[in-house]
Amino acid sequence: MSLSRFGAATLMLPLLLPGMGWAKEFAEPQVGEDVAMPAEAQDGTLPPLPDESRPLERGAPSEVAPTPPGRAPAPDELPVLPPLAARWGYLLRLEATTLTLLPRRGVGEDEGFIQLEPTLVIDGGEKFGFNAGARVRLRMWGGGEGAGLVRKEDWDSLSDWGQLVRALKLGADTSPVALWVGAMEGFHLVSGHLVQRYSNRTNPDYHPAGALLIGTLGPLYMEAFSSDVLGARLMGGELELDVQHVLFGRPKQPGRYTLSLSAIHDWGRGEVKSAEVTLAHLDATAVVLVQREGRRALEMHVFAGWGGRPGAGGAWGAVAGVGADSVTPTLDLRLRLEARRQHGGFRQGYFGADYELARLQAAGTSGLPLAHASFPEGYSVYAEAMVAWDAVLLGEVLQRHLHLSMGAEAFSWGRVDVDGRLAVQLLHRNLEVAVKGLAVGMRQPGARYLASGEVRWRFWGGRLYALGQGGTLLYPTAEGPLRPGAFASLGMGVDNGR
């Protein structure tokens, strides 16, 4: 498997960007530090999925020897640590915050809650991790006649119980078979041409647990996923064939020349029913440049593909592009640039950042669900960048002074879509700021905008922290149109992370 597999999954990413999932109006746990566990588990987060830690090894992220100020450690200064499997750890956390849900544009009423959020994390090393916990929102005011003590929208369906499992990992990136269960944020399915930057909790009243199964057998690599393990929603997978392996035997660098086929079906059940949709895509990828020197690597790849909507005549699309991945001890950079063609209502990245809202009501003035809304034929240019940087040594999740993920698509008929997330660590990692923005249908009537942010400040040796959050939301309604809202939260948390 080569570095160029841009897609893979990021089920654990919401834990890096707390509160940045639109559906999770209020934060997931964020950064703490070590309890004799690897840095990637220090804040209740588990080691990230392949999209965040691909086969190119950077080495262990923690226990770095002191380095003179202003100078990153040289490769030969980086420590050699015992296997992660030998370093079990745990984390306990409790957050207590006030939460206010506010109406926007004169629609709805405000509600107030006391929010309690316990968290338990068990880190079993490279092949096992578990993060459990859920928010309990106790009503202080609002909600209308008959409103209960606990906010019922958080627990009114079987799928909502999936929020108890924030992250479960069985197997490592290099295992023949591996399973991840939890929240999906910014998820790509391998090539990313069908499932691209998808988040399964964009709907603020829907809290499912998704799952990703990864398997490798000879020249075959497979990813199968479900957006909701307790409900009939998005299901599908992508099968990738290593052509060089088939023709010439096992290569020294697997995954340089591949063909892949993906298919996705939305059963449309979930908390709110919607139309069923099926899409398929065929892709070819070639890695044209590979440079490796010690713990530094650079890869460039080109790709092309064609997709369609089975059963819908004339619905097809084509794509071609180039990508680059670069990894050093302090930087992980991934770039992608694509030219796309859409025809008959098909588009690449159909299951994207906005999908859980768009399946109910697409951006624009039609008011129709995405499956029934018209999409003009034309061309587009898509660009995506993922940057992780640390001044000392890049860790898997927590040890990152900067984490940026952004995708943008501009269409020939005027529309522009942008999705981005940014998180920074300041003041010896005691201050953290995270923001997220989503804009769909810009430069067109009925454009959709969402934004949220969070600030966390650790003090008293890092065990106690203050946090504040705020942002905008869109709620589904029985009448059909999405209802705009906003939230604000302020509180404290304590854990044994330092």
Model-derived features: where do they sit?
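N-terminal low-complexity, acidic/Ser/Thr/Gly/Pro-rich segments
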Residues: 79-99, 111-115, 119-121, 129, ...
